[in-house]
Amino acid sequence: MGVPLPIRMTVLRLDDGDLLLHSPIRHDDRLRRALERLGRIRHLVAPNSAHWMFLPDWQQHCPDALTWAAPGLRERRPVKKASLRVDHDLGAAPPAAGTEEIEQAIVPGGFGFAEVAFFHRASRTLVLTDLVLNLEPAKLPPLARPLARLTGTTAPDGRAPVYLRWVIGRKREQASRAAARLVAWNPERVIFAHGRWFERDAAGALRRSLAWLLPG
């Protein structure tokens, strides 16, 4: 959108006690130590082509963590230039391979875009990245508020920004099937990278946010 946005990292604690960091934010020693008190940081996830830039620092401080990246991310020129190590490409199998605690779906788009969505079964939490923006105007720069409202990305009825809807529309049929799967999971909460997450009536809010993409 061309303006600074509030950003969120989501942390999942897996059945074995290890932590999965989804879309890691800027590394901070205090934050890392707080997380390490909760469990071993084992998985670092870059869920789409826009959410990877802080990963090199996390890799440096968590050398034993595995890095998982959205399909095609490792081939992008900025990623290669940054020397980001990608251990695994996200595909049909989730990072917690061999377990049934996480399901995932790939929402594809044109120009090499793909966003990988995660559903944590135990907490019934759907973790997205940019597929929904639900920005709170009070937390945006004053000049950015009209633009956010114009693009339909403000709370409580946020959705994907216009440019991303256009990109995803390039593979609408496949993306529509993936969106239907997200809704079918019937999540109790939906967390995403930007804005107020869906804490109540999450399934209904998700359906409204994805109405532009859902079949029919």
List the model feature ranges, each with a label:
Residues 1-26, 30, 82-150, 177-184:
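Catalytic core of the metallo-beta-lactamase
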Residues 21-23, 42-49, 68-70, 127-130, ...:
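Active-site neighborhood of phospho(di)ester-bond hydrolases with catalytic His/Asp-centered motifs
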Residues 25-26, 43, 54-57, 61, ...:
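Cap/insert and terminal regions of metallo-dependent hydrolase folds
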Residues 74, 111, 197:
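Residue-level detector of flexible, active-site-proximal loop/helix-junction positions
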